[in-house]
Regions:
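Anion-binding (especially nucleotide phosphate/pyrophosphate-binding) glycine-rich loop
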Residues: 2-135
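A generic local secondary-structure boundary/capping motif
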Residues: 72-73, 114-117, 125-129, 142-149, ...
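Short secondary-structure transition/capping segments
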Residues: 77-80, 137-140, 264-266, 310
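Gly/Ser/Thr-rich helix-start
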Residues: 36-37, 69-71, 80, 108, ...
Length: 346
């Protein structure tokens, strides 16, 4: 893609210290251990460097794919002609400016965030202590477990809004949180960090709850195998794992991809899974569950399609706006001329 190639050249010329990897295999980053190369993989050292990368992409009509720990994503083996921006170096974590709050940048792991909250006697993030993701991804998908969700503890979110090239703070109540999704999925932005509003509690009591949740997780989930977390979102009135199990699909295998024999809600890589294996496996499960129960399962894993391109069409949008303004100006001028011609001297 011409715009992407231009952006890469400008970034290399103007940001020589940036960790920029060309033709980077995504299997090296994704927890499922599947995926071909993306055209470029940028790892900014801080928010300013990340903003600069996004500026060059924006000016060349390209949108990036911003990722954290890549724990719920699958890339095609053929690779994609896109740039991925990793938030892994955005790891600032501190107590917030207001009482009982914590500020964390997008790359902070949810486990580290929960531990920091515990160490400071702040309760509310226990549920997140075993979720294998980062703050950015957790906020984007409203991650949750054991009855808790990110929306319950988010006071505000800091995003880089691409159309205006500016940092914006969004109140938690304005984030459009729903079950395993947020309003940020619908706008051209990147999550940079978040402020969490928590409740004071005894650190030992917080730690005990975290330990109990993590012991349950270890006992019930296939943490010893590559996976992308829960394969499907929880349907209304039930659980995906229970439906899959009831339909006799626990252990169902396509190539190297398998519905876990330990927990039917997980798809795992038995060692040689491919993108096509995962797609076929999940598609079969969805069709079979629907055939037997008339319930449609919605994937929780983000599977990026083959040939996907990310375009920022701001120039076209801007031109459309300008054309509309010019047309309106013509109409206004025509209206004024008509009014003038109606005026007759007395």
């Amino acid at each position: 893609m011409e715009g992407l190639e231009k952006a890469i050249e400008q970034i290399k010329e103007n940001m020589p210290k940036l960790d920029l990897r060309e033709n980077e295999p995504m299997r090296n980053h994704c927890s499922f251990k599947v995926g071909g190369a993306v055209r470029a993989f940028a790892v900014p050292s801080d928010l300013f460097e990340m903003s600069k990368v996004m500026f060059y992409l924006h000016m060349n009509g390209v949108s990036p794919l911003t990722l954290g720990k890549c724990t719920n994503v699958i890339f095609p083996e053929e690779g994609l002609d896109i740039m991925v921006i990793s938030t892994e170096n955005l790891r600032k974590l501190r107590l917030g400016e207001t009482e009982n709050t914590i500020y964390a940048e997008a790359g902070v792991s949810l486990a580290k965030l929960a531990q920091f909250a515990r160490d400071n006697g702040l309760s509310g993030l226990e549920f997140a202590s075993g979720i294998p993701g980062s703050v950015g991804g957790g906020v984007l998908m409203n991650a949750g477990a054991y009855g808790g969700e990110m929306k319950d503890v988010i006071e505000s979110v800091v995003v880089y809004y691409v159309p205006t090239q500016a940092l914006t703070e969004v109140r938690g109540s304005d984030c459009g949180f729903e079950y395993r999704r947020s309003g940020f999925e619908k706008i051209n932005c990147a999550i940079m960090g978040a402020v969490f509003k928590l409740t004071p509690d005894d650190p030992e009591a917080i730690g005990a709850r975290m330990k109990e949740m993590n012991e349950k997780r270890t006992a019930s989930q296939p943490l010893d195998m590559p996976s992308a977390g829960s394969a499907f979102k929880r349907p209304v009135g039930g659980y995906a794992a229970a439906l899959i199990d009831r339909c006799g699909l626990k252990g169902y295998t396509v190539g190297g991809a398998q519905i876990s024999q330990k927990h039917a809600g997980f798809a795992v890589n038995t060692g040689s899974a491919t993108y096509d294996d995962v797609v076929e496996l999940l598609d079969h499960v969805r069709r079979e569950v629907y055939a037997q129960t008339q319930i449609t399962l919605e994937p929780e894993i983000r599977i990026y399609p083959k040939g996907m391109m990310l375009v920022d069409d701001w120039r076209e949008r801007k031109q459309t706006i300008i054309d509309g303004m010019l047309e309106q100006a013509k109409q206004n001028a025509a209206g004024s001329a008509a009014e003038s011609s109606d005026v007759r001297p007395s």
